Amino acid sequence: MSSVTGFYIPPISFFGEGALEETADYIKNKDYKKALIVTDPGIAAIGLSGRVQKMLEERDLNVAIYDKTQPNPNIANVTAGLKVLKEQNSEIVVSIGGGSAHDNAKAIALLATNGGEIGDYEGVNQSKKAALPLFAINTTAGTASEMTRFTIISNEEKKIKMAIIDNNVTPAVAVNDPSTMFGLPPALTAATGLDALTHCIEAYVSTASNPITDACALKGIDLINESLVAAYKDGKDKKARTDMCYAEYLAGMAFNNASLGYVHALAHQLGGFYHLPHGVCNAVLLPHVQEANMQCPKAKKRLGEIALHFGASQEDPEETIKALHVLNRTMNIPRNLKELGVKTEDFEILAEHAMHDACHLTNPVQFTKEQVVAIIKKAYEY
């Protein structure tokens, strides 16, 4: 087995107020002529996609828009967006939004060059050709989908989320302009911020972690601990929003290279079955999965180390679990899976599907089906 470790991030990333204009100038200087914007109805309604469209048109690009991406984007979203791209013969894709818009755009850009159906690329590095260049403008902090090689697409017929982990879907440019996040509602700030925290923690206890991903994960936790609640309480807090831009990007650097674990493996199934918000599912599951992970000595030690980054006086994994529950309560996250509408009769199939999700492969403990069901049950009854 090779001992070589790769580290994957976009070639270019822009941060700070004014990053939108910087990105538009960069696209013009590359001499592209036709762009497809992929976004969602909410971003279209507040005028942000129109603003980016105007910037690009002022720089002599012809712009088409697909703005029907739904939360937890599905195969139909990918197909419809690809149709718009082909009609215009777009050279590049510009995604605007959170994880849903970016994931849909990645899938569209991948199919534009590789052909076939998006399900053909489920798993790790199944494509042969580079996707069309993707410029990912982020509006949440967040999924980090604007900078990762992950894309998650729902197969509604099978009630599953397909995890496509492929170097070829890595965006060409990632854009984090905190001014696009000032209007983010508190509930979405909480859900996306806790998604970023889950990325940090799962990457830190991952079997594929390394010193670089560890540094990214721990710094991400520090920034989230300092700034997430502040951003939740005051969405226009410029420092908190800026810190969260960096935090979610650091989290992305961590999990893009160390991968994830059973929190995400289970959250994907909850999203596929019940169309629940991804970040909320992660937040509810995170303490329970990590508690189960403590049977692994290395994971237990690392969870103890994380406690120091939450302000504990000593390494204690129980303090980390406690801090996660407190953070959830502070930001009004549902207490358990029961409150989210999960059904007890689905526990078995949720567990089975999670055990086939690529994210479980780097969890520090390879649970039996009975253990996965027990985790779901605990998260349901808590």
Swiss-Prot record:
| Chain's role | Alcohol dehydrogenase specific for ethanol. Acts mainyl as a mitochondrial formaldehyde dehydrogenase and has no effect on ethanol production. Shows drastically reduced activity towards primary alcohols from 4 carbon atoms upward. Isomers of aliphatic alcohol, as well as secondary alcohols and glycerol are not used at all. The role of ADH4 in yeast metabolism is not yet known, but ADH4 is not responsible for the production of ethanol during growth on glucose nor responsible for the oxidation of ethanol to acetaldehyde.
Description of what induces expression: Induced by transcription factor ZAP1 in response to zinc deficiency.
Q: Spell out the note in the miscellaneous section.
A: While ADH4 is expressed at only low levels in laboratory strains, it is often highly expressed in brewing strains. Present with 125 molecules/cell in log phase SD medium.
- Record localization: Mitochondrion
Name the needed cofactors.
Zn(2+); Fe(2+)
Q: What is the pH dependence?
A: Optimum pH is 8.3.
Top-level taxon in the UniProt lineage: Eukaryota
Reported regulation of activity: Inhibited by EDTA.
Keywords assigned by UniProt, alphabetized:
Iron, Metal-binding, Mitochondrion, NAD, Oxidoreductase, Zinc
Looking at the keywords, is Mitochondrion present?
A: yes
EC code(s) of this entry? 1.1.1.1
What organism is listed for this UniProt entry?
Answer: Saccharomyces cerevisiae (strain ATCC 204508 / S288c)
Give the record's GO biological process terms. amino acid catabolic process to alcohol via Ehrlich pathway; fermentation
Quickly give the catalysed reaction: a primary alcohol + NAD(+) = an aldehyde + NADH + H(+); ethanol + NAD(+) = acetaldehyde + NADH + H(+)
What InterPro entries does UniProt report for this protein, alphabetically? ADH_Fe/GldA, ADH_Fe_C, ADH_Fe_CS, Alcohol_dehydrogenase_Fe
Q: Which family does it belong to?
A: Belongs to the iron-containing alcohol dehydrogenase family.
Q: How is the cofactor bound?
A: Zinc. May bind iron when zinc levels are limiting.
Binding residues annotated for Fe(2+), in chain numbering: 195, 199, 264, 278
Please spell out the taxonomic lineage of the organism that makes this protein: Eukaryota, Fungi, Dikarya, Ascomycota, Saccharomycotina
Which top EC class is given? oxidoreductase
The entry lists its GO molecular-function terms as:
alcohol dehydrogenase (NAD+) activity; ethanol dehydrogenase (NAD+) activity; metal ion binding
Q: Which Pfam families match?
A: ADH_Fe_C, Fe-ADH
Q: Which residues bind NAD(+)?
A: 40, 72, 99-100, 139-140, 148, 150, 161, 183, 268, 278
Q: What is this protein called?
A: Alcohol dehydrogenase 4
Q: What's any one GO cellular component for it? A: mitochondrion
